């Protein structure tokens, strides 16, 4: 059961990361159409104007392959490439950060609980009510239908039970009494 919940939570989280990257990609495409807006996301290089964009050139030179601004890491890549769908943008998130997200529909609410806390949940239908009882406490439960009434009696007390239909009336007689009555 726990494995199923954890698997579902991980799948939902990966789907959320994928949706986030798609939304960021569409935002960046819209920003690429608006050269006046330059938003820098953490972990990304600032967007560079395209080589065909000659508006705002102060130096009078052709854009060509000459980089504007500081050289970027990687050497060969002088312009940031748009991210591919499905790739995660920005710094990779640590495990602790992912647990602080609000719960997804269908997942359990809040952070995953530990084993000891799960025993304090309200009982599910069909389960016994309350926390599991110990062996000694089970004798004090109310009798189930079809069981004998009251707590189980010990061996010496069984002779005092009321007779069951088909048995002889009264307590079972001792062997010596049977001989005296048969004579």
UniProtKB/Swiss-Prot annotation:
Its GO CC terms are: extracellular space
The entry's localization annotation reads: Secreted
- Pfam families reported for this sequence: Pro-rich
Keywords assigned:
Repeat, Secreted, Signal
Question: Which residues lie in Low complexity bias regions?
Answer: 86-183
Main subcellular location: secreted
Q: Where are the sequence repeats?
A: 81-100, 101-120, 121-140, 141-160, 161-180
Signal sequence residues? 1-14
Question: Bias category Acidic residues: which stretches?
Answer: 52-65
Return the annotated region ranges for Disordered. Answer: 22-183
According to UniProt, the name of this protein is: Acidic proline-rich protein HP43A
Q: What organism is listed for this UniProt entry? A: Mesocricetus auratus (Golden hamster)
Recite the lineage of the species: Eukaryota, Metazoa, Chordata, Craniata, Vertebrata
Gene name in the database record = H29
């Amino acid at each position: 059961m726990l494995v199923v919940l954890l698997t579902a939570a991980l799948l939902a989280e990966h789907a959320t990361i994928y949706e986030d990257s798609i939304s960021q990609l569409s935002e960046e495409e819209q920003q690429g159409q608006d050269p006046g807006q330059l938003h820098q996301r953490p972990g990304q290089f600032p967007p560079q104007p395209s080589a065909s964009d000659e508006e705002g050139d102060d130096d009078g030179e052709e854009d060509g392959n000459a980089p504007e601004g500081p050289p970027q890491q990687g050497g060969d890549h002088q312009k940031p490439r748009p991210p591919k769908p499905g790739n995660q943008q920005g710094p990779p998130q640590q495990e602790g950060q992912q647990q602080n997200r609000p719960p997804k529909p269908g997942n359990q609410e809040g952070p995953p609980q530990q084993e000891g806390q799960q025993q304090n949940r309200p009982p599910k239908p069909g389960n016994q009510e309350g926390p599991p009882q110990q062996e000694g406490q089970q004798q004090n439960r109310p009798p189930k239908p079809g069981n004998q009434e009251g707590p189980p009696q010990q061996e010496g007390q069984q002779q005092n039970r009321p007779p069951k239909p088909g048995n002889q009336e009264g307590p079972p007689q001792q062997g010596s009494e049977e001989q005296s009555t048969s004579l």
